[in-house]
Regions:
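Activation segment signature within eukaryotic-like protein kinase domains
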Residues: 162-163
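Protein kinase glycine-rich loop
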Residues: 56-64, 68
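Conserved short submotifs of the Hanks-type protein kinase catalytic core
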Residues: 128-141
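C-terminal lobe substrate-recognition/regulatory segment of protein kinase catalytic domains
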Residues: 278-323
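C-terminal intrinsically disordered, low-complexity extensions immediately downstream
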Residues: 350-405
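Short beta-strand micro-motifs within the conserved protein kinase catalytic domain, predominantly
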Residues: 118-130
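Glycine-rich ATP phosphate-binding loop
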Residues: 67-90
């Protein structure tokens, strides 16, 4: 594979997926029903052993879906972790585990990358609450950092560094056949050293066979691409690239790019048409055949000059990359690898070093607030910038669980 322009290094090759659940010995005879209680007892013992490794500390966040606690290892009080206790809901009572939890555990066990949050262990409690032992990321999230315009300033070099870390995580997911489907600033947590970590894999899924339909009612609405508003049921990594483009624009402008209010599909499509252009057969062949297609008003696709006026601070190459990440036609939109190969990364200014990045993204409590949310929610704080009220419940989350859709 040719070298990537991103920091003059090749895109990171797919790491081997971790196999964290041991397979039963091949010689085990499961036909004898008398072994079942022994296996169950062993599982309970192992679960108890794992649970007893940690001492829970203060609660960092609490929501309808989960509570998040700071904790440390009994064997080493300096080793901090975050324990996400997922609350028992209707699907837990029916299936034994929530859909989102199953997705998150599955993919975090498989994906091991410096820019993806680490899952250290999983254990349950007697009341069936599932506990995920996650990497402790004490600097909060990118959303709080973006919103703190009073005390935090950052540069194009900082934006380049954050986006590069995000793109490496997304490239790694896609190279391993995983779509994240909920990329947004409050799912980008900040480690003590300034590294960005992609979190919340509750809406993730494996890339499907081209003929297998997938749900279109996914991805937090402000970061959802037009093909999903048009009810496309066959899609790939382009949906994540659009979300990354939205994050890129938000970092530059310090405001949400597609902030429709009231937040519904029709208003979102109108806003995308206003800011990017109306999808038509000329710029997106086949779009009118999508069953959810609507064109409130035909608005020409914005020129590069229009984009430069709005995002001049990131430079011409940065604007070029942004335009290609937010291409209306998902077949024209850059792939995650294509994003990493763009010359933006090696142009001046070069990405900031970790030690020079702003790190005050709200602290450990913000990590808790981010981790407690269910996938697809907008910030539960309030106004359109996420600083007050709680409109996350209005975001549609009809997840079709058939075939892990």
């Amino acid at each position: 594979m040719a070298a990537s322009p991103a920091l003059d290094v090749p895109p990171e090759p797919p790491f081997k997926r971790r196999k964290t659940t041991p397979e039963p010995p091949s010689q085990m005879d499961t036909s004898d029903d008398s072994s079942a209680p022994l296996v169950a007892d062993l599982a309970e013992q192992l679960d108890a052993q794992e649970r007893k490794k940690y001492i829970k500390g203060k609660k960092l966040g609490s929501g309808q879906y989960a509570d998040v606690f700071e904790a440390h290892l009994i064997s080493d009080t300096r080793k901090l972790v975050a324990i996400k206790k997922i609350k028992v809901g209707p699907e837990v009572k029916e299936f034994g585990i929530s859909y989102d939890s199953l997705r998150e555990i599955k993919f975090l066990q498989e994906l091991d990358h410096p820019n993806i949050i680490k899952l250290y262990a999983v254990f349950s409690t007697k009341n069936q609450n599932l506990n995920l032992v996650l990497e402790h990321l004490p600097q909060g999230d990118l959303l709080k950092l973006i919103q703190d315009t009073q005390s935090i300033s950052y540069t194009p070099a900082d934006i380049k560094s954050w986006m590069l870390m995000l793109q490496r995580a997304v490239y790694f997911c896609h190279a391993n056949g995983v779509l994240h489907r909920d990329i947004k600033p409050n799912n980008l947590l900040i480690a003590a050293n300034g590294e960005i970590k992609l979190a919340d894999f509750g809406l993730a899924r494996a890339m499907a066979d081209p003929w297998q339909p997938m749900t279109y009612n996914t991805i937090t609405i402000w970061y959802r691409p037009p093909e999903l508003f048009y009810q496309a049921q066959h899609y790939g990594g382009a949906v994540d690239v659009w979300s990354c483009g939205c994050v890129f624009a938000e970092l530059i402008a310090r405001d949400v790019l597609f902030k429709a209010w009231p937040e519904n599909e029709i208003n979102m499509v109108k806003l995308i048409c206003e800011k990017v252009g109306t999808p038509t057969e000329e710029n997106w062949p086949g779009v009118t055949k999508l069953r959810g297609y609507l064109a409130p008003e035909i608005i020409p696709v914005k020129s590069k000059d229009d984009w430069i006026v709005a995002f001049r601070s990131i430079g011409e190459l940065g604007v070029d990359l942004l335009i290609k990440m937010l291409a209306l036609d998902p077949r024209v939109r850059l792939t995650a690898e294509g994003v990493l190969r763009h010359p933006f990364w090696t142009s001046d200014p070069r990405p900031s070093k970790l030690e020079n990045l702003p790190k005050k993204g709200g602290g450990a409590e913000t990590m808790g607030e981010s981790l407690k949310q269910r996938g697809g929610e907008l910030p539960r704080d309030g106004d359109a910038n996420g600083s007050g009220g709680g409109r996350g419940d209005k975001v549609a989350r009809k997840i079709d669980f058939g075939a892990m859709k």
